């Protein structure tokens, strides 16, 4: 160490020098600032020794593994002994407000870090633990203080601006000479931003007597006046107008330093350098400020004594600090001007000292913002790099960044590869870029005229283009909108990492605009392929003054391959996905639009097409080049191992320095090489010998060849130094033999034939019988065993034998699925060959069930066959599942025919083969006569391509099976029987599967057992089938509440009618053939998986193949069932159960249509089953009846017990004094609804249960009911006893009491429902004890007894089937409110519980989504669990007291005080996060329940309704009361609360009474119409009769006009929403062809309807997904009513004897109402004409209003929406004739569904 350095070292403030150097680590931490500023430093590498754990320095002998794990540090080398060397590294202590070192200038080059300490002296601002609690109030109520600051500044500026004209001015930093007015004119937006910046400092002023930083001021002196903070808080409370007189006086005194108030202002100004956290949206801070990494506000920390202190993690940036001072100056000037006589205190010469000091501070900060960073670069030879501003930048930094971007590119490519057969980068490079058959010889630089072929893409021969993109050019039109969007988004995302790869690969850096404008085609083209090296070369000429000559930069081979792949493959995919209608790009100055006669007439679509085919780096979503903000995000995270990240400017200077000092060694001797490197970095070369020894130099100074050579050599040096090609096996020498890389030679001399690829052949793994056993153990566990020997032998036959075609008939429930499931799993386990199999089922309803069963345990990869048809084989899926329509489709046939070619081109191997073709329930090919025309396409299928065909059925005797197979083009069954163990192939096998007879295995005949003997089959003739079916279902659910049932109806209309009428009794799912495929699958899956669903109603399609647990009953109402349909339906009862065949008396006989099987006959069902299967008849013999005709001998014990219980229940009902059916109809309906309440799931009940606070059991009594009421007492037992009476309802009501047991005892009576309702009490047990009576739905208390359906009082127990409330227990089925329990199926509100099947009742219309995506933060369960500060706990308690019902399912209307019946019609369903505009209550990284920092979260454990959710609903209430303009202004007014939902709720609650009154006043007419159903008559509207012909029409004319409008829309395929929005008749065929809601929404999104709606209407005031989500499940109740009206419409039409008219389906109907809602012109017209209605501003209210009925001119009733359409049509046309309208009535079969 030098003597001078030693002296500096001795002077350093390093007290623990000796003890630190005695440490065994080579690296020693040193906090000395002076030391590192005085002594030269170096960069050394260190590693952690695994054995000792010590930090060691990397030496020459350090091992390779330790070198890889090493890290670098800037250190000072110190010799502490003989050959003992230590290294000091600077460790900066985080400066806190209690003290701490000043940061080192060496480590913090930006002067702001010194300025906040030297100029603002923030280190002297000391905060203690009490201060932190006080500061917590600011963060807890930041929205309030933002609003307060804004209002105060706005009021002060308003008063100051109203002063008489004052000519006084002051000089400003930007206008120093003439000066500017002291009170400047400010816009409201500027005042609002200033207010956000002032909020923390306004808080400091209001708490000046509490914070320790003002301790010097707080010491009172005689005669001084203190700031009255309480008065300030009262005066500055946000109200209109704000009292600012006292505040103005305080500001004047602070400026004049009166009573030491200047000290307060002095401290507040110094505190401006502190970062109190970013403000809300629209606040201070620009993009540069927000981009600072690791920025944190003042946050709490714990010192060694356990005390909370505040630490400054990041000071304000110069730009943000300047804006804060701007706000402070504006506030001081405005506030002082309010009361001051003159403004001399702000004079530049004679002003007060405080103002001069503020000006000095401001000018220092302003000048700091204008200074550019100075880049101090030093050479670090040890690491082969440099140091830029103290940050190490070397080759490893560049390589780490580069390969991280490459990995990101590959990951995004992998996402595309999951959807497409993507060629790899190496494939494209080998096939085209390195292939010498492809020539890339062309002149460089762009041409003056735009040409289509001005791209190296056009130089690629067609034959290679076809091979490169075999999948992308096929079936493009069949790609869904979601898939297209996924493609475009993925390619947009991988564009950015590719830009970074190019940036590093060229070495000599680009400025960003130069990199941004890289183009592979067009007049600005600068991307070429060098024909010699096959690398990408870039010719760019960007310069700020436009005088730069073109620069040539060459990419390395690896980057060249990626760029070439991006242009040839990915960009073409992107163009196909965007489609011809893409028009996001506008004409910008950076693009050259040539080739058009009149550039002004060029459309956005033309411009977008040019850009896509020209420029590389695009953001197609925004319609622009990749923005710098997007590009630079990678710098914040990459490279991962770098301790300090460089920004883009530092990186640019670093790359230039690397090129100077590290890349080349000949610079000192070769001046031309050195100068070329500077020019390639766009640096000007200084003239003079002092730099390069030449007078002047430019690339024009040498010949063209020499200039090119110099630039190529510069790029070559960079490529070699960086080493990107070191592991890349595509060197320049190998490019000359690119033919070796291309797989295979041409199959013939024909030049146009496709290039064949080398295929890898592997030996086949042998099959073993053990494979089937292993597959079974994978699927069912280690204890797996086959059902019987037949099942084992069949599995081996399918898996092992060479028989190409097998047919199996087995009884329902036998396990036919496992016969092919196990062989498929065994095939998938083989590693030599990938088998792809296909399964087809007859109906869509089976699709979901099959996929669920086959994909369980993850043994098989299962996907819909639609994926294969549209996108081809993905190489991952083992089994594709589809329906018969898919099997018969031409596209599927074509895919199979081209299988070998597809596999060769895509997978480059022949080891991907077709496996099994499996057809389930194949008898339908013969028996489904009406569908046989649809099966014609199956005959074209190449069956020979499959390894084996398997046909399965439970109802296919030989005759049916043979005919079915022949109908699809196969030979049929083998004529003579074959032994099941015979594995030899016959001679006909050589002709292929289609020519080989199918081998039949008939397990029913082999076992000689009649199927369905385990089911009790009952044939009943009744007066009314629906009534009898309802009785049976109610009885079943009374006995087995968790069971399920299937009801088979004869027509689609009957299905819907039964569903509508039974929905009030139990949860129903209905299905028939007119539903869309997706809807069928969804409903089937819902019924199978949802345990709360009770009944599945459908036509015969629900009887085949569905496997349903807990199914106990099947009811047949169809009098046309044939024997196959009967067997399939009864076969759903896998484990036994009851099957009822209900027929009307004297109406069973039915004729069968031609070709169909005859219906079943009246008589013994078992004999008919035997006859069908060809079994021996036992008519008149013993054993004839098996499970039928009253025989129970073959039934299981559970089935027999179920029959007996059903019989007992029927007897009790028959002997009761008054049965339910004997009651009057209205009485019966009411009681039935109550009786079955616990199975009821209608939308009305769900709404009431949650939002109306209504109990499932009401307290009303009827007909001799007895009530026992107890008030303000403790009742151990409260009883109501009734003898010999009929109690429809017996209630025990208790108020403010604790009831241990509340009983209602009834003797010799019929209790339809017995309940106990309590208010503000705890009911441990509510029960009803009954003696010799019939209880339809009661709960009985029993002691030491066994009752399958009773309820006992249980504590800490488990009830299998109870109907009572238990505490700390598990209830399988409960119907009351439970606490701290787990309810498997409940219809009530639960607290701190888990509801496994209460989706409809626990969360309704938005709450479910809210709870799923935005759960309330549970403080006790979070990882940051801590003891909250007193301020936070106090705030939490206050909020809990202010909003006490958030533990329940509360809504804001309840909070306002509305009654439940009012809430039902004003209910705010559909209000979720998307209702709020972007930026309102949608901040991320904070608590999802209150939007506060996690340390300050005010949510409480058990809170069900978050404050954030209540804020959404409160915002919706405000929307109810405001029109569009007022609501937009309101959003601006509450902008301080956009990030503070809790503060907004407080603000909202202040106006609680006012809002309630306003809603009652504004919506009185709405409630009168919707709640009291007051009639609207068009004749009562004077303006309507005078101003519209529609109001003089009859109801029939209005209906006819409505049908005509829809007929025209349907014929022209017009987009509905757009038409009703602005009468724009835009075509959208996809909308009318959509089969389900999802496809419908995709069609609307594809044509840009939602985007236009947001841009044109008030829909932009909601979130981007709000309107789109209206088509989901928000309007289920309204949808059910509408679909029910469709059936009523059809019934009315048929009753009148007219042809039914087509009416819109639900999605089109909803589109119409949404379009009308946002049509401002129409709304104004309608509200003017129809005087009984007024404005509604929420979409749910509009939808409800549209469905009320109005009286037309002839006093006939029509829905209001029909009147709306008529008015809309009138506005579109000149006039509407008064006479009869011509309508188009489309005939329809009465049995079909009305609608689309």
Curated annotation (Swiss-Prot):
Low complexity bias (residue ranges): 1294-1397
Kindly name one Pfam family recorded for this protein.
DEAD
* Ranges for region Disordered: 743-767, 1254-1278, 1294-1421
GO CC annotations on file: cytoplasm; nucleus
Biased composition (Basic and acidic residues) is annotated at 1398-1421
Could you tell me the EC number(s) of this protein?
Answer: 5.6.2.-
Gene Ontology MF, one: ATP binding
Cite the SMART domains for this sequence.
Answer: DEXDc, HELICc
Q: Which residues form the Helicase C-terminal domain?
A: 1031-1180
Q: Which UniProt keywords apply?
A: ATP-binding, Helicase, Hydrolase, Isomerase, Nucleotide-binding, Repeat
Q: A GO term (biological process) for this protein?
A: telomere maintenance via recombination
Summarize induction of expression: Induced in absence of telomerase TLC1.
Q: Where does ATP bind?
A: 810-817
EC class (word): isomerase
* Domain Helicase ATP-binding, chain residue ranges per copy: 797-974
The UniProt entry's sequence similarity note says: Belongs to the helicase family. Yeast subtelomeric Y' repeat subfamily.
Q: What does this protein do?
A: Catalyzes DNA unwinding and is involved in telomerase-independent telomere maintenance.
Q: What else is known?
A: The protein tested in started on residue 800; there are 4 identical proteins in yeast.
Can you name this protein? Y' element ATP-dependent helicase protein 1 copy 1
Q: Which organism is it from?
A: Saccharomyces cerevisiae (strain ATCC 204508 / S288c) (Baker's yeast)
Q: List the gene name.
A: YRF1-1
């Amino acid at each position: 160490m030098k003597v001078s350095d030693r002296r500096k070292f001795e002077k350093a403030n390093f007290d623990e020098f000796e003890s630190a150097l005695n440490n065994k680590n080579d690296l020693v931490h040193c906090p000395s600032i002076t030391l590192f500023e005085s002594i030269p430093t170096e960069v050394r590498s260190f590693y952690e020794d695994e054995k000792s754990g010590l930090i060691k320095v990397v030496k020459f002998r350090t091992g390779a593994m330790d070198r890889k794990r090493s890290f670098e540090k800037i250190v000072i080398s110190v010799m502490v002994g003989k050959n003992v060397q230590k290294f000091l590294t600077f460790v900066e202590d985080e400066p806190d407000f209690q003290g701490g070192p000043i940061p080192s200038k060496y480590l913090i080059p930006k002067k702001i870090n010194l300025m906040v300490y030297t100029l603002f002296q923030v280190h002297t601002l000391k905060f203690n633990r009490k201060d932190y609690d006080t500061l917590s109030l600011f963060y807890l109520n930041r929205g309030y203080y933002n609003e307060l600051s804004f209002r105060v500044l706005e009021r002060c500026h308003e008063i100051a601006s109203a002063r008489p004209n004052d000519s006084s001015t002051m000089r400003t930093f930007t206008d120093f000479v003439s000066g500017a007015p002291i009170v400047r004119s400010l816009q409201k937006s500027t005042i609002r931003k200033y207010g956000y910046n002032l909020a923390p400092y306004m808080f400091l002023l209001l708490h000046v007597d509490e914070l320790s930083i003002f301790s010097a001021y707080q010491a009172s002196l005689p005669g001084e006046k203190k700031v009255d903070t309480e008065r300030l808080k009262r005066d500055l409370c946000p109200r209109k107008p704000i009292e600012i007189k006292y505040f103005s006086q305080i500001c004047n005194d602070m400026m004049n330093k009166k009573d030491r108030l200047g000290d307060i202002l002095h401290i507040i100004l110094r505190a401006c350098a502190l970062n109190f956290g970013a403000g809300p949206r629209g606040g201070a801070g620009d993009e540069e400020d927000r981009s600072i990494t690791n920025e944190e506000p003042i946050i709490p920390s714990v010192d060694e004594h356990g005390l909370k202190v505040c630490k400054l993690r990041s000071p304000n940036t110069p730009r943000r600090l300047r804006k804060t001072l701007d706000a402070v100056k504006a506030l001081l000037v405005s506030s002082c001007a309010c009361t001051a006589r003159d403004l001399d205190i702000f004079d530049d010469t004679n002003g007060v000292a405080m103002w001069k000091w503020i000006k000095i501070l401001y000018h220092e900060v302003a000048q700091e913002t204008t200074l550019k960073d100075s880049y101090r670069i030093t050479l670090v030879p040890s690491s082969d790099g440099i140091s830029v501003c103290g940050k190490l930048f070397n080759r490893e930094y560049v390589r780490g960044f580069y390969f991280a971007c490459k990995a990101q590119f590959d990951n995004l490519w992998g996402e595309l590869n999951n959807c497409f057969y993507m060629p790899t980068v190496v494939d494209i490079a080998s096939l085209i870029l390195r292939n010498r058959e492809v020539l890339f010889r062309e002149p460089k630089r762009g041409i003056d005229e735009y040409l289509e072929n001005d791209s190296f893409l056009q130089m690629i021969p067609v034959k290679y283009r076809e091979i490169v993109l075999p999948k992308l050019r096929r079936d493009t039109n069949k790609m869904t909108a979601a898939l297209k969007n996924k493609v475009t988004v993925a390619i947009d995302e991988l564009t950015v990492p590719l830009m970074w790869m190019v940036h590093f690969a060229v070495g000599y850096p680009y400025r960003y605009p130069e990199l941004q404008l890289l183009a592979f085609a067009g007049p600005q083209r600068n991307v070429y392929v060098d024909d010699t090296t096959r690398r990408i070369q870039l010719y760019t000429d960007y310069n700020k003054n436009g005088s730069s000559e073109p620069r040539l930069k060459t990419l390395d081979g690896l980057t060249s391959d990626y760029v070439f792949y991006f242009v040839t493959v990915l960009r073409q995919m992107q163009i196909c996905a965007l489609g011809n209608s893409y028009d996001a790009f506008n004409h910008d100055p950076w693009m050259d639009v040539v080739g058009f006669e009149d550039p002004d007439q060029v459309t956005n679509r033309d411009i977008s097409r040019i850009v896509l085919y020209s420029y590389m780096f695009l953001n197609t979503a925004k319609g622009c080049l990749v923005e710098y903000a997007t590009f630079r995000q990678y710098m914040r995270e990459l490279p991962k191992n770098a301790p300090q990240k460089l920004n883009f400017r530092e990186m640019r200077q670093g790359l230039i320095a690397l090129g100077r000092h590290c890349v080349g060694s000949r610079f000192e001797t070769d001046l031309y090489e050195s100068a070329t490197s500077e020019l390639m970095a766009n640096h000007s070369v200084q003239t003079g010998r002092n730099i390069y020894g030449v007078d002047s130099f430019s690339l024009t100074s040498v010949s063209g060849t020499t200039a090119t050579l110099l630039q190529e050599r510069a790029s070559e040096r960079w490529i070699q130094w960086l080493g990107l090609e070191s592991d890349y096996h595509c060197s320049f020498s190998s490019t000359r033999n690119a033919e070796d890389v291309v797989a295979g030679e041409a199959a013939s001399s024909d030049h146009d034939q496709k290039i064949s690829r080398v295929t890898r052949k592997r030996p086949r793994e042998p099959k073993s019988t053990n494979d089937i056993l292993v597959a079974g153990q994978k699927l069912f566990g280690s204890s797996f065993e086959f059902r019987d020997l037949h099942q084992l032998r069949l599995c081996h036959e399918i898996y092992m034998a060479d028989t190409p075609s097998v047919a199996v008939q087995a009884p329902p429930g036998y396990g036919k699925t496992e016969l092919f499931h196990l062989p498929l799993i065994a095939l998938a386990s083989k590693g030599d060959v990938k088998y792809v199999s296909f399964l087809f089922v007859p109906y869509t309803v089976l699709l979901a069930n099959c996929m669920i069963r086959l994909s369980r345990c993850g043994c098989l990869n299962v996907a819909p066959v639609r994926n294969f048809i549209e996108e081809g084989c993905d190489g991952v899926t083992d089994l594709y599942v589809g329906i018969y329509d898919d099997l018969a489709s031409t596209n599927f046939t074509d895919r199979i025919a081209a299988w070998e070619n597809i596999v060769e081109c895509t997978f480059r191997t022949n080891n991907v083969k077709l496996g099994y073709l499996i057809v389930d329930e194949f008898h339908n090919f013969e028996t489904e006569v009406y569908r046989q025309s649809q099966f014609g396409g199956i005959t074209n299928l190449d069956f020979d391509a499959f390894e084996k065909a398997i046909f399965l059925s439970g109802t296919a005797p030989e005759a049916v099976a043979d005919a079915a197979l022949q109908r699809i083009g196969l030979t049929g069954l083998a004529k003579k029987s074959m032994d099941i163990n015979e594995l030899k192939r016959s001679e006909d096998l050589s002709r292929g599967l289609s020519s080989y007879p199918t081998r039949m295995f008939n397990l029913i005949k082999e076992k000689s057992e009649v199927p369905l003997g385990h089911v009790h089959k009952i044939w009943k003739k009744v007066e009314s089938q629906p009534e009898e079916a309802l009785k049976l279902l109610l009885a079943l659910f009374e006995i087995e509440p968790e069971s399920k049932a299937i009801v088979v109806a004869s027509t689609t209309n009957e299905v819907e009618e039964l569903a509508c009428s039974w929905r009030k009794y139990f949860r129903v799912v209905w299905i028939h053939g007119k539903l869309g495929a997706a809807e069928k699958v969804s409903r089937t899956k819902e019924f199978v998986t949802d345990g709360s669903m009770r009944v599945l109603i459908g036509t015969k399609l629900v009887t085949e193949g569905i496997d349903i647990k807990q199914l106990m009953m099947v009811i047949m109402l169809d009098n046309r069932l044939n024997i196959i349909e009967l067997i399939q339906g009864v076969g759903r009862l896998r484990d036994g159960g009851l099957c009822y065949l209900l027929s009307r008396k004297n109406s069973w006989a039915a004729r069968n249509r031609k070709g169909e099987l005859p219906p079943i006959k009246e008589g013994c069902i078992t004999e008919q089953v035997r006859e069908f299967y060809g079994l021996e008849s036992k008519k008149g013999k013993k054993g004839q009846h098996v499970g039928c005709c009253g025989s129970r001998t073959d039934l299981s014990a559970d089935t027999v017990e179920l029959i007996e219980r059903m019989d007992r229940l029927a007897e009790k009902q028959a002997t009761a004094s008054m049965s339910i059916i004997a009651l009057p109809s209205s009485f019966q309906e009411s009681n039935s609804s109550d009786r079955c309440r616990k199975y009821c799931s209608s939308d009305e009940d769900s709404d009431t249960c949650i939002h109306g606070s209504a109990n499932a059991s009401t307290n009303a009594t009827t007909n001799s009911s007895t009530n026992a009421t107890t008030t303000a007492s403790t009742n151990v037992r409260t009883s109501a006893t009734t003898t010999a009476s009929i109690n429809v309802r017996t209630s025990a009501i208790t108020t403010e009491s604790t009831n241990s047991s509340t009983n209602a005892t009834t003797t010799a009576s019929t209790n339809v429902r017995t309940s106990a309702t309590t208010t503000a009490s705890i009911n441990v047990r509510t029960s009803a004890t009954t003696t010799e009576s019939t209880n339809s739905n009661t709960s009985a208390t029993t002691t030491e007894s066994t009752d399958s359906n009773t309820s006992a009082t249980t504590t800490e127990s488990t009830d299998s089937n109870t109907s009572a409330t238990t505490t700390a227990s598990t209830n399988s089925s409960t119907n009351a409110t439970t606490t701290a329990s787990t309810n498997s199926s409940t219809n009530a509100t639960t607290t701190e519980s888990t509801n496994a099947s209460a989706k409809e009742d626990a969360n309704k219309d938005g709450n479910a989504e809210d709870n799923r995506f935005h759960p309330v933060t549970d403080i006790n369960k979070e990882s940051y669990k801590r003891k909250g500060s007193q301020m936070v706990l106090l705030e939490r308690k206050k909020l809990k007291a202010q909003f006490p019902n958030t533990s329940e399912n509360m809504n804001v209307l309840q909070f306002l005080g509305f009654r439940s019946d009012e809430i039902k019609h004003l209910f705010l369903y559909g209000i979720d996060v998307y209702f709020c505009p972007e930026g309102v209550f949608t901040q991320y990284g904070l608590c999802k329940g209150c939007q506060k920092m996690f340390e300050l979260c005010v949510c409480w454990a058990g809170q069900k309704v978050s404050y954030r959710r209540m804020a959404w609903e409160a915002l919706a209430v405000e929307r109810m009361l405001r029109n569009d303009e007022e609501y937009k202004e309101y959003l601006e007014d509450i902008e301080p609360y956009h990030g503070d939902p809790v503060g907004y709720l407080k603000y909202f609650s202040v106006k609680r009474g006012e809002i309630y009154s306003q809603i009652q006043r504004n919506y009185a007419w709405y409630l009168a119409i919707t709640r009291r159903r007051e009639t609207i008559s068009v004749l009562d509207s004077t303006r309507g009769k005078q101003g519209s012909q529609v109001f003089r029409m009859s109801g029939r004319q209005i209906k006819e006009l409505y049908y005509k409008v829809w007929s025209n829309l349907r014929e022209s395929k017009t987009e509905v929403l757009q038409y009703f929005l602005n009468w724009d008749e835009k075509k959208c065929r996809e909308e009318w062809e959509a089969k389900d809601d999802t496809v419908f929404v995709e069609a609307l999104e594809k044509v840009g309807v939602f985007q236009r709606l947001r841009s044109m209407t008030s829909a932009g005031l909601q979130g981007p997904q709000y309107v789109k989500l209206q088509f989901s499940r928000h309007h289920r109740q309204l949808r059910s009513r509408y679909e029910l009206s469709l059936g009523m419409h059809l019934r009315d039409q048929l009753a009148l004897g007219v042809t039914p008219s087509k009416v819109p389906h639900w999605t089109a109907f909803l589109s119409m109402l949404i379009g009308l809602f946002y049509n401002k012109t129409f709304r104004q017209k309608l509200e003017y004409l129809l005087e009984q209605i007024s404005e509604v501003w929420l979409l749910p209210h509009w939808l409800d209003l549209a469905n009320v009925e109005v009286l037309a001119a002839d006093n006939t009733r029509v829905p209001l929406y029909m009147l709306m359409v008529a008015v809309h049509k009138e506005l579109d046309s000149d006039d509407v004739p008064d006479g009869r309208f011509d309508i188009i009535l489309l005939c329809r079969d009465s049995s079909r569904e009305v609608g689309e």
